[in-house]
């Protein structure tokens, strides 16, 4: 059996780029909660002792940007300079302007257009992906890297590993074989964890705790063997982290946000963007489409692409590739997808309920992935029934 190795990485909620994603989406949540028609393009950057929020926002909501920044930093665990940032003492800069009227008239006609006539907020192409290798219909390498990162945060916050600090990165290499286009995991080849820690813990303690409390509960035993390689804090020291260690910026972890390098990516980031931005809403609808194709048994693996022009409601193109795993031709699956899913931005917003803020809805997406999550707020993860005739064996 010929196999190959594929690697996916993830980062924790305390990584500087992810901190910025979460702040941008916390701002979006606050705007949508008060004004569902808010137009939000919110960016965040951070470095030592400083967070800046900037961008274009048009909303009727009253937003305390500084409070959102400090609350988000605090909830992640940035409560002192020792851990990389002090939520209560850091400098917060705000530079928010209104959305360009040129963009506004082209996209939503200053709220005069019907939902089905609302144009895309920009040009671009987005991809959705699904694979039957996990219950989430997501790539195993990505799922494991993401869940290990989430587990690091869990054992830090519940006190299991008191030496942990907020920043951290994970990476998992999986050995696969290609079953006529479908990806079948064989084993976990390598696990890499680099996590921020305090001054008191030894490298031996770090390795022991990570294996026992992080890796063991997450990676199924069937994927581990005596050949699995573990790199646990291989640099030897990771005390300085968060914004003190590295600058952070919204939208720099787009592969971590999606499929861990599998499928494809059109390049557009998600966080801080309202649903008229098809970078986000378009990526959500094609994930639902790809997932529905696989969940309905039409294929074991699927990639769906959609593309847009600014101000134009109808997509320019829709594409489906099942990597040779489809039970019916891809062109027939494409026809079913186009009949089932409405790719117009205004209709995607309604069908996926993307104007609803609150409950930290979009902030939740900004750490540990936008896809493959079992959460009712992730409406794009709901499988739609597809009408098709399964070929007779």
From Swiss-Prot:
- EC class name: transferase
Which cellular compartments is it found in? Cytoplasm
* Pathway terms, separated by semicolons: Amino-acid biosynthesis; S-adenosyl-L-methionine biosynthesis; S-adenosyl-L-methionine from L-methionine: step 1/1
GO cellular component terms, A-Z: cytosol; extracellular exosome; nucleolus; plant-type cell wall; plasmodesma
Tell me which InterPro entries the record gives.
ADOMET_SYNTHASE_CS, S-AdoMet_synt_C, S-AdoMet_synt_central, S-AdoMet_synt_N, S-AdoMet_synthetase, S-AdoMet_synthetase_sfam
Q: Which reaction does it catalyse?
A: L-methionine + ATP + H2O = S-adenosyl-L-methionine + phosphate + diphosphate
Tell me one GO biological process term: one-carbon metabolic process
Assembly: Homotetramer. Interacts with GRF3.
Task: Quote the protein name from its UniProt record.
Answer: S-adenosylmethionine synthase 2
Upper taxonomic lineage: Eukaryota, Viridiplantae, Streptophyta, Embryophyta, Tracheophyta
Q: Which gene encodes it?
A: SAM2
């Amino acid at each position: 059996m010929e196999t190959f190795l594929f690697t996916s990485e993830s980062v924790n909620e305390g990584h500087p780029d992810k901190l910025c994603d979460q702040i941008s989406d916390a701002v979006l949540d606050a705007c949508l909660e008060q004004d569902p028609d808010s137009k939000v393009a919110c960016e965040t950057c951070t470095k030592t002792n400083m967070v800046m929020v900037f961008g274009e926002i048009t909303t009727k909501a009253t937003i305390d940007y500084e409070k959102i920044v400090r609350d988000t930093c605090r909830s992640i665990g940035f409560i002192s300079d020792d851990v990389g940032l002090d939520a209560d003492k850091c400098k917060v800069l705000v530079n928010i302007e209104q959305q360009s009227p040129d963009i506004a008239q082209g996209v939503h006609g200053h709220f005069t257009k019907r939902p089905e006539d609302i144009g895309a907020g920009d040009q671009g192409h987005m991809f959705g992906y699904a694979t039957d290798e996990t219950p989430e219909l997501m790539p195993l390498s990505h799922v494991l890297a993401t869940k290990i990162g989430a587990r690091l945060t869990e054992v830090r916050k519940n006190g299991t590993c008191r030496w942990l600090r907020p920043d951290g990165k994970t990476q998992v290499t999986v050995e696969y074989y290609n079953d006529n286009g479908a990806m079948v995991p064989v084993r976990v080849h390598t696990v890499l964890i680099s996590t921020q820690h305090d001054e008191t813990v030894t490298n031996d303690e770090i390795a022991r705790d990570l294996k026992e409390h992080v890796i063991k509960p997450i990676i199924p035993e069937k994927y581990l063997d005596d050949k699995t390689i573990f790199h646990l804090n291989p640099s030897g020291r990771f005390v300085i982290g968060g914004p003190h260690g590295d600058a952070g910026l919204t939208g720099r972890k787009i592969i971590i946000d999606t499929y861990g390098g599998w499928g494809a990516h059109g390049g557009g980031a998600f966080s801080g963007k309202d649903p008229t931005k098809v970078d986000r809403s378009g990526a959500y609808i094609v994930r639902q489409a790809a997932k529905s194709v696989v969940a309905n048994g039409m294929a074991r693996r699927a990639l769906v692409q959609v593309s847009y022009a600014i101000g134009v409601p109808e997509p320019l193109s829709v594409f489906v590739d099942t990597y040779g795993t489809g039970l019916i031709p891809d062109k027939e699956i494409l026809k079913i997808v186009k009949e089932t899913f409405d790719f117009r931005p205004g209709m995607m917003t309604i069908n996926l309920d993307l104007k609803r803020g609150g409950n930290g809805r979009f902030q939740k997406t900004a750490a540990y992935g936008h896809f493959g999550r079992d959460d009712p707020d992730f409406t794009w993860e709901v499988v739609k029934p597809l009408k098709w005739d399964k070929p007779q064996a």
